[in-house]
Amino acid sequence: MNIQRKELLVTSFALFSLFFGAGNLLLPPLLGYNAGENWFWVTIGFMITAVVIPIIGILAHARLQGTLFDFGKKVSPIFSLIYCIVIYIIAVAIPSPRTAAATHEIAIHSAFGTSPSLTSAIYFSLVLVFVLNRSKILNLIGKFLTPFIVIMLLAVIGIGLSSSAFTTGISQIETPIVTGILEGYQTFDAIGAVVVGAVIIVSLNFKNMKVEAFESKRKLIRRSGFIAGTGLFIIYAGLISVGAYYGSEIEVNSELSSDMQRANLLRGISIASLGEFGNTVLSILISLACFTTAIGIVAGTADYFKGLLKDSQTVYVVTAIIACVLGVVVGQLDFKSIITVAIPVLLLIYPITIVLILLNVMPEKLATPLIFRAVIISTILFSIPDFLGAIELREFVEPFVEVIPFAKYSLGWVLPAFLTFVVSSIVQLKITRDR
């Protein structure tokens, strides 16, 4: 295998693994189970926010080859600075601790009966060790951890599908595509794209690619994004279909929280597919998937603040330690509590992130500061009702929900953002033509 192909595979595997965390493994099977006969349409919706948008985010990184700051600087440097800080605080305060909580509840507690504090402390100590060995992250994840994760996932999906009766239950979901889109929010993959994309770029620079031609790195990152996206598509579609076809044979206690329903369903599928060994496989899978994601989040956060403060290695180390300590503290909460906090935040920050990703892959003439500012302002304004509704202030936003298209599906920002983009593009073209 030549060096370029090897580099492509390692980068693709690392990118896949940095994306694939707790939610990515737990969400799809229960989504398929609830969708039943409509599992295909749920899959389409899920792929939009969990695969397509994140991979477009990687393409934007390939184009910019900078930091997360570059995503929003056309709105204004102040906006971009605030956006970056908010994104990284969210990343280390919600999805990173969530990986520890999921590892404890599903993999560790059932086997060893340890306390959440002990699990989180050991977990983030190991994360810190990997993050402090910054130059080796890409190889450690891409060469060793990811292939193991992918092989085990394909085994569970393949055996599960081959032994199922290919019958589904009646769908419990009224709007499958919309439900899939909103479930895709909970993977955090769009936010993950802007965070881990920067991790990949810094990692490539560590591997002596800093002097490589801009176009060479862009090609490598783009190809890696497509390969990782294809892998995510196959795994997600497989997990959703297994949940739909095989899940009907497994009893899911409706009185449990949705998070424990997800865990129990996946455990049931694993055991039914692989026997008692399936429980061990699931525990290892979740632990590794969560671990690699936590490494990416902490490393990405430390990279950003290091670059922000004159490339200081001390800042990198201190930021990594703070992120890991925060992970230990928040990681002691149960998975459900973390998700409850995450949903309102996601409904506000996710639309902004999606719009920034899409604008950054537009042709230059359609990605001017005027267009950026107009579309982002529109997106923020029309995301506020979704945020307020999620924090039990629904009565204040009910009049807006009744008027704004798609607002009842928590997608009220979509049409205003699109119309603002069209109008501002026309205005921009007119300004350009008049000069």
Feature roles, as predicted:
Residues 31, 99-116, 205, 294-321:
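Helix-loop-helix connectors at the membrane interface of multi-pass transporters/channels
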Residues 132-160, 342-354, 373-381:
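Membrane-interface loop-to-helix entry segments
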Residues 5-15, 40, 76-89, 118-122, ...:
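Select transmembrane alpha-helical segments in multipass membrane proteins
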Residues 35-125:
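Membrane helical hairpin/interfacial module
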